């Protein structure tokens, strides 16, 4: 529901404002003008915009569900933190495919955020001279056939295999972990 300078009388304003509170990402304010109360929409994006674009990322439902699951499993506070982690793990593959990595892009976002807060013009991104840390695991897009990965052994699992892994509840995963540990004890 979008409101754009829709004038209403005082009794309708309260009904519309209470209805909009349950669905909003925008604020509703009443201004005094001739003809009664007037509702104006103020959209406010709570997130940092990258390079002035107000766009959202769309992704397949399976990928989004996997990001939510990884956020819980890795103990991250936000899905954005999980996506940053995934990008850092994929850095060598990104550099191989594009010729540059995400470090330069994240530095550009920092510069854009600083510039937007000071209202100055955008400057070119600064290059980062710090050497990147070697990743703890590599991004392997080809899943080897016939290899079974342990339930919580995500550090050595290819990314595509992680996406295809079904979501489990905490109780199910605890049972699976116990079963996996029991199998390891029998084999060793």
From Swiss-Prot:
One Pfam family matching this protein: TCP
One Gene Ontology CC term in the entry: nucleus
Record-annotated TCP domain positions: 43-97
Keyword hit for Transcription: yes
Sequence segments annotated as region (Disordered): 26-53, 115-136
Compositionally skewed regions (Low complexity) per UniProt: 116-136
Alphabetic keyword roster: DNA-binding, Nucleus, Transcription, Transcription regulation
GO MF annotations in UniProt: DNA binding; DNA-binding transcription factor activity
Biological process annotations from GO: circadian rhythm; regulation of DNA-templated transcription
Ranges of Basic residues composition bias in the record: 44-53
Subunit architecture: Interacts with SPL.
Name of this protein: Transcription factor TCP11
Species, as recorded: Arabidopsis thaliana (Mouse-ear cress)
